[in-house]
């Protein structure tokens, strides 16, 4: 999709059996205090990373390269997954992840692996190039409906 003439990639590249295996494979990373729950952990650097996780990273890099490389102003070196981590979003919790962006990252990749069937929510995105008017309720935004298996890749400058 080109939202605001900004390339946002949405795909569902994996089937349910792969997603089931992925969920099973990452359980050890998501236990309280496990490496996958810590922001300083780069999961791509962990030893013995499950093949399903490597496949997710490879697919994100493949799609980013396929759709973003033709849009760049200058030649790019080979792309790679620079940092990976998990986020668990708990509905109705006091703690919320604040709107943020990822500086100069070319592509930010997200995959939703465990999503409630009801009220899954939306990924909200603001493109700061159009001017984010924080005090104005009419600041333009886009929303992407979240569902299991959805992979979203967007430029790092998108506030989400």
Tell what function each PLM region has:
Residues 80-158:
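Catalytic core of non-heme Fe(II) oxygenases with the double-stranded beta-helix
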Residues 1-77, 85, 94-96, 122:
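Non-heme Fe(II)/2-oxoglutarate
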């Amino acid at each position: 999709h080109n939202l605001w003439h900004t390339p946002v990639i949405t795909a569902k590249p994996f089937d349910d059996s792969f997603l089931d295996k992925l969920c099973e494979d990452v359980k050890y990373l998501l236990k309280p205090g496990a490496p996958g729950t810590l922001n300083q952990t780069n999961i791509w650097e962990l030893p013995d990373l499950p093949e399903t996780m490597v496949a997710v990273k490879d697919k994100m890099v493949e799609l980013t390269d396929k759709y973003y490389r033709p849009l760049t102003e200058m030649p790019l070196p080979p792309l790679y997954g620079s940092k990976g981590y998990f986020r668990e979003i708990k509905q109705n919790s006091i703690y919320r992840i604040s709107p943020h962006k990822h500086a100069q990252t070319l592509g930010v990749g997200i995959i939703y692996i465990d999503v409630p069937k009801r009220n899954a929510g939306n990924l909200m995105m603001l493109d700061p190039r159009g001017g984010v008017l924080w005090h104005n309720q009419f600041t333009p935004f886009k929303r992407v409906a979240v569902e299991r298996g959805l992979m979203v890749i967007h430029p790092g400058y998108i506030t989400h």
